[in-house]
Amino acid sequence: MCFTNKGRAFVTVVYDLPTSENRTAKGLPVQNFFNIDKDNGEVITALLPIAEFNAEEYFLMATKKGLVKKTSLSAYVSFVKRMNSSSITAVNLQEDDELIGVEISSGDDDVFLFADNGYAQHFCEYYKKKVTDDSETDDATDNNEESSDEEGSIDRHAGSGVRPSSRSSGCIRGIKLRGDAHVVSLMVVAPSQIEKGQCLIASANGFGKRLALADIPMRNRGGQGVIVMKNLERNGAVIGAVIGEENADYMLITNQGQLIRSSMSETHLISRYSAGNILMRMNEGDAVQALQSIPEDVVKSSKEVAEARQKEKEELAALEAAQKAKDAEAEAIKAYAAPQRGESVETVENTTENTDNQ
């Protein structure tokens, strides 16, 4: 399924997408598969492969203004059965708001929202059904539950997370943003992954840091969050955050088209109070536009392919070297045999050639 910044959802089957073994292949325009309104600034913000539309799993969505919403995957079954290029509304957005991310959740996962002002909000999505939940009041203005940003223990199953709602409903507040700040990244993490989990945060001026997820304290939904990136005067605004597996890679892409790929392990794991380190040196007037993670299994597969190709090259080089050595040995034998018989090397070669022809 494909989600756009305008809150629309599209669906297609994977076997309809073009395949290529060439990493430099351009592929086909996304408009060939989905009716994206490019002229109106519509872009894809999430692309999720789904095998089954399980009623116990959810699409958890986040918007630029810090609002969140979750809807059961089963609510999209009828839409998927139609399987055409038309779209449906996945979320009703407020004016000037955009959908920035969609993830699949279990209903009891941890949610992280990262804002461009260096703040991050961590809360549990678990929601305990109440008697009044039969009415559809999913607009953010009707759900301004404020949370405390004070340090302290939070019960993840207190039930004040994100209530499942219908496709036609609005959103509720996930993080209370300061000034003109906006959310740039959404992460959904299983509780079992929090203790050892890490994330990578990047800023517009090429700085970043790797941070333990456990260092971002859990709060109730709707709070202002905590600082995860300081010194924005030097670093620039936060442009994104991704899961930072130890053996994974990441890519940074700039406005001027520069791209680097590096290993997560090469970025120091530091505290959330630290300002961060240089990830990429920028040209004057350039800025980091996007951060993309490359999962550990993809990195491993890429390394295996690269190693296999290198082995093939080495084996081919060894065969060529062996053939050259064999040819050189044959030439040496001819050169040695000619004087012994009182013949020139050319005569020996001609005699050998005539013998071969006969």
Residue spans for each PLM region:
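Short, structured "edge-of-domain" segments at secondary-structure transitions
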Residues: 1-358
